[in-house]
Amino acid sequence: MGVPALFRWLSKKYPKIISSVIEELPQEVNGEEIPVDITGPNPNGEEMDNLYLDMNGIVHPCTHPEGKPPPANEQEMMIEIFKYTDRVVNMVRPRKLLMIAVDGVAPRAKMNQQRARRFRSAQEAREQDEKKQEFQRMLAKQNGDKEQMLQEEVIQKTWDSNVITPGTPFMDILAASLRYWIAYKLNTDPAWEKLKIIISDATVPGEGEHKIMEFIRSQRASPEHDPNARHVIYGLDADLIMLGLATHEPHFRVLREDVFFQESKQRTCHLCGQPGHKAEECRGQAKEKNGEFDEKGKGATLKPFIWLHVSILREYLAAELYVPHQPFPFDLERALDDWVFMCFFVGNDFLPHLPSLDIREDGIDTLIAIWRDNIPLMGGYLTQDGRVDLKKAQLILQGLAKQEDAIFRRRRQAEERKLANEKRRKQEEKARNEERARKRRRSSPSYDAIESPTHAKPRSAGAAAAPPAGLELITPARGELARQTRELTHSMVVNRGNVYRANMANKSAAAVLKSKLLGGQDGQPSDDGESTAESDAQLDAAGPVLGKRKADEAEVGQLGTETPDKPEPAKADELPPDTVRLWEEGYADRYYEQKFGVDPQDKEFRHKVARAYAEGLAWVLLYYFQGCPSWTWYYPYHYAPFAADFVDIGDMELSFEKGTPFKPYEQLMGVLPASSNHAIPKVFHSLMTEPDSEIIDFYPEDFPVDLNGKKFAWQGVVLLPFIDEKRLLAAMSKKYPLLTEDEKARNTVGRDVLLLSESHPLYQDLVSNFYSKKQGAPKYKLNMRVSDGLAGKVEKNEAYIPHSSLVSSLEEYGMPSLEDDRSIMVNYEIPKSTNIHKSMLLRGVKFGPPALDNADIQATKSRAQHSGRSYGGAPFRGGRGGRMNYAGDRQSHGNDRPNPFAAHLDPKFMPGANPGAPMGMPSGWVPPSGNFSRGPPPPPRGGTSYGYGSQQYGSYGGYGQQQSYQQSSHSQSDYYGRGPPAPYNNGPADYYSGRPSGYGPQESRGGGYNRGGYRGGRDTYSSSGHGGYGRY
């Protein structure tokens, strides 16, 4: 999801959701590598059932890695992809299923973002090629014809990562290579014998992660689905966390590289400058060079992986989202859906974020605070099974609108303070350096002792000696300090920049090129997800010698001290230009005039933009919870409206036309620039390059990038014209008859495939049905007992012949062909359901002990009462009004102002008791945070009962007139926080008094915290307004 730093924000706010992956690595014995035996127990202490790979998160870093040379050709890229995938499988060790999902054709709403990203990627590749040509000229001038082979390597064009798009020959190679590698593993690796593998390649429409979510939803709809299956999804996108919550599968983890890991940079010996040991362990050994000038470098250290535990995130959110005195039953599953919905406002791949919300300013907390304060007025949750109630969303947005002016002013004040601190820090650093330089010059040996007398040049007294020509200088913290040169380093340490530049001048042009090309992109994100988008936490490799700041204090590309590797942008000591000036009066008029080019007085246009944005929010929510609601819808603006512009959106009637996805070539023509036309069949090239082309305006060579108040170009808004679908398809239709047969094949819609080995119980079932003398139906439904829990239909794959040879195109890279392929491949069809996916836990879920202790719960509750109010004034007062200053005017301190977050509440409003209840929920009670879905648990029988009104939850089974809660005086102390906290956090005591533990490994049967949410009772989903939901 388009929220850079979301992952980091979550991990800092909810620290226990992150843990390190324990990985067993292959051992080397007598020069031979011994692979890991993954048939053994998982070293992480829990066995995993299903592993899902969002494959683009593997393909991108393997094909154009950061910090090391890229693979030389596409064959080497495939080998890197195999190695990386094998490593991920070995650390997770799935026991039942592996699903590999490659991005196919995306919905139209995503193509706008893809188009901007690919145009910018092509622009960066062109700049890289220009740099290479410049260095090639330097090389030729310096070495003549001596290094002809190296010259040819240098001028090689930068590999175009835009080919990682459906419909290109590269994606064809990737699909065929994955099928070969999976079949090879099934034939040769005993650990894969019982594993089922589903491959959904780029010919299958849909984004990889959403194809995975569709599969999970389809399995949950099956009566025989295991509610306690352990799921792991690998990927770099932050939206995997939201999608994990949206599945409502409690045993869910996200696996990803630790993008903040910088061991090689932080753990460097300060004596010799080499990584891998501390100063006290230094042996003074010379650094081993790789290349004549050490320009090659060692292979990058394997990055560690981390788990993000969605189950623990559920626990945190259970404590944070529970609102005391809310007039309707607490339902964690629906509260989680509301939380996911609110995250969309700070950014996603389909809509720009609202101007007043930023993840680094705790924008999500701001919305949660407004949501908590308005819960009593809303009378229910914002969302229901992927559909948003726009009347309730209107309340949230109007609450935010009242804060917008204060948010913009405080943001500017924070930027100015930060800039002032940065200037002060640099001035202090400069003063310290100058003072130390003066002291060290008096005690340092002169460079004249080394200079040749005939070449020595006179210099003024006290001036630093110039480095002698041809001398390889030693850069502190960059390499070893030889003994004979150590005496020189006193005066050199304060002139690091000059030393570094001198070293660069003494390197050969090839070494300079190698160093610069491997130096990165100035903190610029690439296509491979959030690993680089979250580079705000990453510091430069060479930290300051005379002091170091925390990574948290450094912005993207902005360091506290000079770093010679990456020159600071122009005017680094000034704030970026911003003509809208959101912090000044009249900002809304300037915003719409400059960003949208409309008359500032045209209020209706503002409301039109807001309605389109509200429609987009509804589209995104459905996309996450039910699947793509429309393949053709998109948000038709580059910028978002202000919260104040959402007027009367509650009256909107939303409907989406499903439509059909683009064909692969249509998406290519819609998202690729003309410079990437090598990935598109030649018959379409003229449409992108010829001046008289009817769609030439879709492919500008130069395009504006609006920094929009940001500092770096990659943070700006790419202002490209939106694709007119009708014009594009009309122009392409004239060229389709000219395609070759191979090109036509790449433009078709493909099928998911299922692969398994002959050792799997399902193998014989498939062979007897498709390849025996008495063949069965061409398509049949899987028996889930035989398939080990896999639901769906299978169909014979015409390209597969049993026990034929497995041909490899990578034999020269150690991937051999096999004479007898003992695996099977069939087409697989995900089961379709006519019912919507319900936001609930399933009957039979078993939970382990909670990960959060009482201190964690109390801390989370306390933060929930106060967080998100940085721009609004006083703390929350329980929704009853109080000392809340919405406009940020701190000159008045009266207690008679209404609570601004509950913007539409009567200041005298006070939530009453639950309908029919003898009392309301006392403040301070937080429910157990893992095993509940709807409301507090039923206390022991025999107490008084009270019901919740049918008008609130009449359409939901378990909350209508049939639902009641029993309560006794004894249970009140257990459930409402008046008794000791032990039943929740300390030991296996039960929430149900006198019964076995309700939070341990026992089976839940639709009661307790999952009332109305589990599949219980009569296997139907009682709903007067929604129709039956089959077994729910």
UniProtKB/Swiss-Prot annotation:
Fetch the SMART domains from UniProt.
ZnF_C2HC
Bias (Gly residues) occurs at 1005-1015
Alphabetical list of InterPro entries matching this protein: 5_3_exoribonuclease (IPR027073), Xrn1_helical (IPR041412), Xrn1_N (IPR004859), Xrn2/3/4 (IPR017151), Znf_CCHC (IPR001878)
The UniProt entry's coiled-coil ranges are: 120-152, 406-442
UniProt feature, compositional bias: Low complexity: 910-934, 961-977
The source's superkingdom equals Eukaryota
Main location (coarse class) = nucleus
PROSITE patterns from the UniProt entry: ZF_CCHC (PS50158)
Keyword terms, alphabetized: Coiled coil, Exonuclease, Hydrolase, Metal-binding, mRNA processing, Nuclease, Nucleus, rRNA processing, Transcription, Transcription regulation, Transcription termination, Zinc, Zinc-finger
> What is this enzyme's EC?
3.1.13.-
User: GO CC terms for this protein?
Assistant: nucleus
Zn finger residue spans: CCHC-type: 267-284
| PANTHER family cross-referenced by the UniProt entry | 5'-3' EXORIBONUCLEASE 2, 5'->3' EXORIBONUCLEASE
Q: Which family does it belong to?
A: Belongs to the 5'-3' exonuclease family. XRN2/RAT1 subfamily.
Annotated protein name in UniProt: 5'-3' exoribonuclease 2
Give the originating organism: Emericella nidulans (strain FGSC A4 / ATCC 38163 / CBS 112.46 / NRRL 194 / M139)
